[in-house]
């Protein structure tokens, strides 16, 4: 019994201020001790200005019932960031076989969480297959609608979305300048 319990334990890399792996811990220990770790954040959008928003189930170990402006999750021990993003998108929403754009990394910290986030995006129109134990529902919202309801969202996903929007605006500005 003990061996089976250990085999099902989810292990995560614990990182320092420079995002260097310094240890591994169980996901449960990481949450209980608010250890610094890595996570992926995937902005799923329709390519026409709407963002796919998910409601977290009430059974989630972190911020249950809140809205997420991004898909994603904790990176497992020794897992590559893009591999983690693809795994999370497929597990949570059934998204597979679509290109992912990488938008760099960022750091987020508050009283509940210390995380190095890897930011990705993808375009998808569904249909979506929700992971019942993690996602209770999804809907499409504009960035303005998300901002108007920001108190309903996980703070780390709002930071990821703001960073994506800022980096997207810079890319669009460069493309416009190049086209002129």
Swiss-Prot record:
Annotated Gene Ontology cellular component terms: cytoplasm; cytosol
Annotated positions binding Mg(2+): 88, 92
Keyword field: Hydrolase, Magnesium, Metal-binding
Domain Nudix hydrolase: residue ranges: 35-163
Keyword Transit peptide set for record: no
Gene3D superfamilies for the chain: Nucleoside Triphosphate Pyrophosphohydrolase
EC primary class: hydrolase
Short sequence motif named Nudix box, residue ranges: 72-94
Cofactor(s) needed: Mg(2+)
E.C. no: 3.6.-.-
Any one GO MF annotation of this record: metal ion binding
InterPro entries membership: NUDIX_hydrolase-like_dom_sf, NUDIX_hydrolase_dom, NUDIX_hydrolase_YfcD_pred
UniProt keyword Magnesium present: yes
Pfam families the UniProt entry points to: NUDIX
Family (UniProt): Belongs to the Nudix hydrolase family.
This protein's name: Uncharacterized Nudix hydrolase YfcD
Protein encoded by which gene: yfcD
